[in-house]
């Protein structure tokens, strides 16, 4: 494909998917855009970089409520390309109504027109209906980028060794087994494992079995400590009861940082479960992003110093054409959690995005919070899925899979 004409749409996936599938030499966006053209150019450039595309991207403005102007714009692009011996294809999947009508008027004049059949992951050539199937593997960062956001940190890269992964999965099981005692235990670990500075955490710990700090009491949990040693997360555990002290060593810095983070184990449960499911092509946790795109005049460092909206999502998955945003809670979800997740879903995926709250607490199907989540299109995975080992099944169903 030489030249692809895209009718610019509010839904970002419509603007960029055909470029990923067909990798044309040139892409021309036609129509009015809803944001400054500099931002469109910046996110398009980032999109191309993320996906290794060498296509040349251009923008051709046309008046949104003027059929003649839309028709003239599309016609001039087609004539220019044909005069240079280049084939032209118009993607009519997105775009405003008049732009679509204008593009449709070129059916039958030798210009190819394509349309996305998203239910079957294929493009249809009009009017004959020839189908081109594709297997979309879109990264989580690409979804955020094309919607006008910038990922600036993925908290955990999950570059774990085989040994580390086995240990982490054992600790995840302990997290659920000792759920009622875990929070208090982690508070104790946090106090005895304080960093000397922001870069360094000592792996060797020597601490009292219990103590008070600022009126708060902290106490070790022997059962959990012994289980962590069996799992390999800590080593050389020595509990000296007559001296009311203990000492041990963390397996390494990664495990030390994980063990003092209470909420990370639910995120990691979601991560490893999704990672083992072939339907998800990209899986990330601790994804931080801002609602803007840096450019030459305003680099990322400046964006981060300004009051630009930003979020951290506990888990972001990619399934075909759909981004999946998951908020993990070790408490019952609140309305504020639903509002925040819904705003992210609408901004960075719209009709294509899925949103889920995963909680270790029970959520009654007749409760106001469940009913509101349903009204907002947000799925809920509660403690029953974890207790019955049905997390993978629930993730599949809530992100587009069929009930078994």
Predicted regions mapped to residue ranges:
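Short glycine-centered, acidic/aromatic-flanked micro-motifs in structured strand/loop junctions
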Residues: 31, 92, 328
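Short glycine-/small-residue-rich Rossmann-like dinucleotide-binding loops
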Residues: 9, 94, 330
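Conserved catalytic cores of phosphodiester-cleaving nucleases, focusing on short active-site segments
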Residues: 274, 315-317, 324-332, 341
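Long, low-complexity, Lys/Arg-enriched
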Residues: 1-87, 101-310, 322, 346-404
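Charged helix-capping and loop-helix junction motifs
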Residues: 311, 339-340
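Short N-terminal targeting/anchoring amphipathic segment
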Residues: 86-94
């Amino acid at each position: 494909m030489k030249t692809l004409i895209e009718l610019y749409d509010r839904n970002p996936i419509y603007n960029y998917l055909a470029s990923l599938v067909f990798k044309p030499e040139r892409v021309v966006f036609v129509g009015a855009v809803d944001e400054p053209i500099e931002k469109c150019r910046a996110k398009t450039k980032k999109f191309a970089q993320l996906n290794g595309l060498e296509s040349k991207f251009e923008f051709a403005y046309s008046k949104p409520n003027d059929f003649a102007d839309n028709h003239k714009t599309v016609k001039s692009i087609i004539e220019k390309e044909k005069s240079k011996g280049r084939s032209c294809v118009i993607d009519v999947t997105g775009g405003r109504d008049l732009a679509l009508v204008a593009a449709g008027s070129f059916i039958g004049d030798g210009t190819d027109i394509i349309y996305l059949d998203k239910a079957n992951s294929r493009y249809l050539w009009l009017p004959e209906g020839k189908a081109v199937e594709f297997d979309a593997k879109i990264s989580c960062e690409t979804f955020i980028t094309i919607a006008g956001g910038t990922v600036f940190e993925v908290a955990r890269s999950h570059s774990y060794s085989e040994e580390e992964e086995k240990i982490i999965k054992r600790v995840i099981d302990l997290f659920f087994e000792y759920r009622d005692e875990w929070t208090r235990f982690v508070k104790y670990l946090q106090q005895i494992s304080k960093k000397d500075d922001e870069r360094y955490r000592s792996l060797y710990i020597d601490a009292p079995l219990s103590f008070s700090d600022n009126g708060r009491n902290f106490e070790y949990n022997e059962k959990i400590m012994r289980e962590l040693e069996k799992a390999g997360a800590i080593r050389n555990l020595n509990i000296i009861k007559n001296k009311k002290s203990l000492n041990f060593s963390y397996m390494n810095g990664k495990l030390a940082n994980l063990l003092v983070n209470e909420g990370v184990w639910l995120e990691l449960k979601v991560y490893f479960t999704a990672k083992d499911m072939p339907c998800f092509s990209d899986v990330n946790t601790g994804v931080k992003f801002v609602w803007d795109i840096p450019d030459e005049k305003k680099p990322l460092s400046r964006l981060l110093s300004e009051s630009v909206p930003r979020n951290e999502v506990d888990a972001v998955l990619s399934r075909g054409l759909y981004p999946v945003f998951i908020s993990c809670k070790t408490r019952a979800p609140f309305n504020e959690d639903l509002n925040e997740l819904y705003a992210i879903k609408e901004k960075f995926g719209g009709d294509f995005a899925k949103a889920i709250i995963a909680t270790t607490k029970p959520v009654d199907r007749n409760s106001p919070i469940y009913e509101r989540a349903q009204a907002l299109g947000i799925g809920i995975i509660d403690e029953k899925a974890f207790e019955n080992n049905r997390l993978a099944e629930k993730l599949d169903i809530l992100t587009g899979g069929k009930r078994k």
